[in-house]
Design a protein with these regions (language model features):
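Charged/polar interaction segments and conserved charged motifs
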Residues: 1-5, 49, 112, 166-167
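C-terminal/domain-terminus segments
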Residues: 110-120, 154-167
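A hydrophobic membrane-anchoring alpha-helix module
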Residues: 133-163
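Charged alpha-helical initiation segments
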Residues: 1-21
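Amphipathic, well-ordered alpha-helical segments in soluble domains
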Residues: 6-9, 37, 91, 144, ...
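Alpha-helical protein-protein interaction elements
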Residues: 6-10, 112, 140
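Flexible secondary-structure boundary motifs
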Residues: 24, 28, 32-135, 139
């Protein structure tokens, strides 16, 4: 006795489910790297500018604490990308701790994840109580993270003066 395509939809498993699991795993790595780089930036910024507040002085952990530093110390108060990132991090946490379920342990839907499903119907899909990651989801999320980094860069980099060619 073994697995056959009569008792299990092997096509669905190998073309949708396994790729989704791989994408979920990649999302954990991507966000882990992003959190690490944001933390390194905050520590470096604090040293370079001898700030009164360090990253360790702030509550929270991971990306949330890094953003709190960027908001309070660096001064990026109105990030357009950060609200989107908070939804993606909710999804990441569900992937890491709850098998990518869109419901919490008390069976209540997680609003941020439901909003992502509504916002990206071609990239994320509901499979019962789980979220499936389709092709393109990670690239879309990477673009959101890139937008956030560009906001930080634009905020900390003074506008360049273009030299005048004529007096």
């Amino acid at each position: 006795m073994g697995i056959d395509d009569q008792s299990v939809n092997l096509d669905d498993i190998f073309k949708r489910y396994y790729p989704s699991i791989m994408r979920r795993s990649a999302l954990l790595t991507i966000i882990g790297l992003l959190e690490h780089e944001v933390e390194k930036f905050c520590i470096s910024y604090s040293k370079r500018h001898t700030t009164n507040i360090s990253l360790n002085d702030l509550k929270g952990m991971g990306f949330e604490r890094g953003h709190r530093f960027i908001k309070k110390v660096v001064g990026l108060r109105n990030s357009k990308a950060f609200p989107e990132i908070t939804k993606i991090i909710k999804l990441r946490n569900s992937c890491a701790h709850n098998d990518a379920r869109l419901v919490s342990n008390d069976n209540q839907e997680i609003p941020e994840i439901v909003r992502l499903l509504d916002q990206y119907p071609n990239l994320l899909e509901r499979d019962g109580n789980q979220v499936l990651f389709n092709e393109g989801a990670l690239v879309t999320f990477l673009n959101v993270f890139e937008d956030y980094i560009k906001e930080i860069e634009a905020h900390i980099s003074p506008p360049r003066q273009v030299p005048k060619l004529l007096p």
